[in-house]
Amino acid sequence: SFGWAAVQRLLDFDLRQIRIFSRDTKKQAKMERCLHQANPESAKKVTFWPGDILDLSSLEKAIEGVDCLIHAAALKQVPDCERFPIQAVQINVLGTENVLRTAVAAGVKKIVCLSTDKAAYPISAMGISKAMMEKVAMAHAREASGESKICCTRYGNLMCSQGTVIPLFISQIRSGKPLTITNPAMTRFLM
């Protein structure tokens, strides 16, 4: 996942602390175990904060004293966003509003919001919600008066990351099931 890869890269730098804020405590526990096994000394720099971007009090505590923030929280599975579009808006748009408002108020200097290639000319609930997330971020960037630098970056399908088609296709092939192709004319780009 992006979070795991980002933490591994960030540990290469001389950072005082890396905070992982997530509502998925199972993933946090797994990451903590893996970090301690790989390098117990570096792992001391990483702290885990359970919470939800829709819960302002947990967000405020986690962001206090932070210099840079990477906002990767999202409802990112296209089928989930299609089935639950209100949750896509709540998490991807309103959750981002909470993160940005809290981060700017706390004096965070640099904020990067992760988006998706599906936000360009969106046709899905996920793409639409991420396009709106970008609009929210850019509105905050204009209002931040230079105190907080805010940007968005788009990336596409990361090969073998959670929720991409490759693990799904491997599972379907191994179990002898047909591959689920949404649209045979579609081209999928993987990084």
Residue ranges and their predicted role:
Residues 24, 34, 117:
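Residues in the short beta-alpha loop(s) of Rossmann-like NAD(P)-binding domains
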Residues 125-126, 131-191:
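NAD(P)-dependent short-chain dehydrogenase/reductase
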Residues 9-17, 107:
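Conserved S-adenosyl-L-methionine
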